[in-house]
Amino acid sequence: MVDFGALPPEINSARMYAGPGSASLVAAAKMWDSVASDLFSAASAFQSVVWGLTTGSWIGSSAGLMVAAASPYVAWMSVTAGQAELTAAQVRVAAAAYETAYGLTVPPPVIAENRAELMILIATNLLGQNTPAIAVNEAEYGEMWAQDAAAMFGYAATAATATEALLPFEDAPLITNPGGLLEQAVAVEEAIDTAAANQLMNNVPQALQQLAQPTKSIWPFDQLSELWKAISPHLSPLSNIVSMLNNHVSMTNSGVSMASTLHSMLKGFAPAAAQAVETAAQNGVQAMSSLGSQLGSSLGSSGLGAGVAANLGRAASVGSLSVPQAWAAANQAVTPAARALPLTSLTSAAQTAPGHMLGGLPLGQLTNSGGGFGGVSNALRMPPRAYVMPRVPAAG
């Protein structure tokens, strides 16, 4: 405990007047009264329900066990309610002790006034004339010191007594068996084991009896025949589906084989075609070379390339085409066969038409010359008509 007598009145008075007061203690006492009232009501209701069940339709060992488990809980609620009520009363005692100590404590302004008066007396005590007044002031201050200390000691003693009267609260007792779940699990496991053992003991004689009887067959032909009867109606559609799949597979294989054969033929044809094209190209080159050589020799023998003359500003005409002078002279040697026909219309037509298919080109020497180019001229000339029907004069 704090030695309040060693503390000056300024400290004790300041602590008492600066605190929250007794209002918090009074509020706490009211709350404890409410808790006590609720516990008393709960205990009374619980007790009435238990007695109503056990004295009515529920009678037996289970009812007795329920009463034995519920009675401690009812007693605990009643005891706890009494403790809460006692706590409320003791809190009120502490609040009353505070109020008493507060009333006995010297107010801080009085103590401050006493100290201020002492300072004035000491300051004006030049010749010692204030000595008696200073002594009286110090005596009053001592009385204040003693009064505050007594008030604090009394408040502390009363609060300690009220606290010591309180009893510690206990936890609520268990109204169920904590090992009940474990015992239930053990009982269930034992029941399962017992049932399995009983079933095993019942099956052993039956198995021995079956072994004692002669076995008919190791294969269950009856069951297999029933199974075959159930499956056989479904085998025909399955076989049809399998046949269809086989047909599709065969068709696919045929197509693959045809494609493979075509691929092989193409692989064999490609080199042969390439060889044929290469051979034809070589033959064409050789033919053109031979034709060029023959043409050159014919031109050389006929003298076409021997002399070249040029005349500035003048050219011969073959029809509407301007040609060199040599071409015009050569063109006169070509005489169309149509001019020898006895018909006048044909003759006039032959005179107005060009001499031959090449439109007056200078091929006279080429056709009349006996050189090696005559074969080419004969090849380019149209074959003679086997028969020409004469025009009848009566037809106009």
From Swiss-Prot:
The gene is PPE19. InterPro entries: PPE_C, PPE_dom, PPE_sf. This is Uncharacterized PPE family protein PPE19. GO terms for biological process: response to host immune response. PANTHER family: GLUTAMINE-RICH PROTEIN 2. It comes from the Bacteria. GO terms for cellular component: peptidoglycan-based cell wall. Disulfide bonds: none annotated. Belongs to the mycobacterial PPE family.
